[in-house]
Swiss-Prot record:
Zn(2+) 1 binds at H54, H56, H111, D128. Zn(2+) 2 binds at D58, H59, D128, H166. Keywords: Hydrolase, Metal-binding, Zinc. Gene3D superfamilies: Ribonuclease Z/Hydroxyacylglutathione hydrolase-like (3.60.15.10). GO terms for molecular function: hydroxyacylglutathione hydrolase activity; metal ion binding. It is an enzyme of class 3 (hydrolase). Pathway: Secondary metabolite metabolism; methylglyoxal degradation; (R)-lactate from methylglyoxal: step 2/2. It comes from Aliivibrio salmonicida (strain LFI1238). It comes from the Bacteria. Its EC number is 3.1.2.6. Monomer. Binds 2 Zn(2+) ions per subunit. Thiolesterase that catalyzes the hydrolysis of S-D-lactoyl-glutathione to form glutathione and D-lactic acid. This is Hydroxyacylglutathione hydrolase.
């Protein structure tokens, strides 16, 4: 069984540390090195590898220093993104073995053109593609690409734990309630999230089951969501609904 620890970074980033019961570990999307190095020292851990989901600086900024400190580590990341420190470029359908667990690489373009996610041991590391109650902005890809990427993730088992890279849940829920103000589950969950955040606690990981109930970007087939954007779309396809939601969220 793999153990997951969050390493907070910047204002709202999570760097994820994956380890088993020995003193070896892997980190996902280390945007800065200092908090990773501090965590390794505190817990007596040895860094074996780095997993990267996409090329944005707040996800790779710490890689050069970590490579200097651990010159023999593997740096795994998307084959179609400009990341010069990669030692193992990977793409959709490839596998990465971590502590005797196989993680599959999923192509989830949209936020960036080559964004990938990693799924294994019922744990999903999805960078900036799927957030709790939200999704990433379309910096490089299209709405259609992001829609299909999210559908790919939504097809994962309900019990899948979702480890996204930012603590955006509270603000995302405010938007979700603007879309579905009569969603009782959303209202109750937002109250829970606000209590957690008031106490300085994380809302991540979430689960795929929960996201299907609270995330408007995974609920594009729901009549309530379609109705919320009916004046903003030319047709009622799910892709058009998603695109309208994303435009609305950008301005929210």
């Amino acid at each position: 069984m793999l153990l997951i620890k969050s390493i907070p970074a910047f204002n709202d980033n999570y760097i994820w540390l994956i380890h088993n019961n020995d003193n070896h570990c892997v980190v996902v999307d280390p945007g800065e090195a200092a908090p990773v190095l501090a965590c390794l020292k505190e817990h007596g851990l040895i860094l074996d590898a780095i997993l990267i989901t996409h090329h944005h600086h707040d996800h790779i900024g710490g890689v050069p220093e970590l490579v200097r400190q651990f010159p023999n580590i593997n740096v795994v990341g998307p084959e179609n993104e400009p990341i010069p420190t990669l030692t193992h470029p990977v793409g959709d359908g490839d596998f990465v073995e971590l502590f005797n667990e196989k993680f599959m690489v999923l192509g989830v373009e949209g936020h960036t053109k080559g964004h990938i996610a990693y799924i294994g041991d019922e744990k999903l590391f999805c960078g900036d593609t799927l957030f709790s109650a939200g999704c990433g902005r379309l910096f490089e890809g299209t709405a259609e690409q992001m829609f299909h990427s999210l559908q790919k993730l939504a097809a994962l088992p309900d019990e899948t734990e979702v480890y996204c890279a930012h603590e955006y849940t509270a603000s995302n829920l405010a938007f979700a309630l603007a879309v579905e103000p009569d969603n009782d589950y959303l209202q109750q969950y937002r109250e829970k999230v606000l209590r957690l955040r008031a106490n300085g606690k994380a809302t991540i990981p979430t689960t795929m089951q929960r996201e299907k109930l609270i995330n408007p970007f995974l609920r594009t087939s729901e009549a309530s969501v379609k109705q919320a954007v009916s004046s903003k779309v030319e047709n009622d396809s799910e892709v058009a609904t998603f695109a309208a939601l994303r435009r609305w969220k950008d301005e929210f």
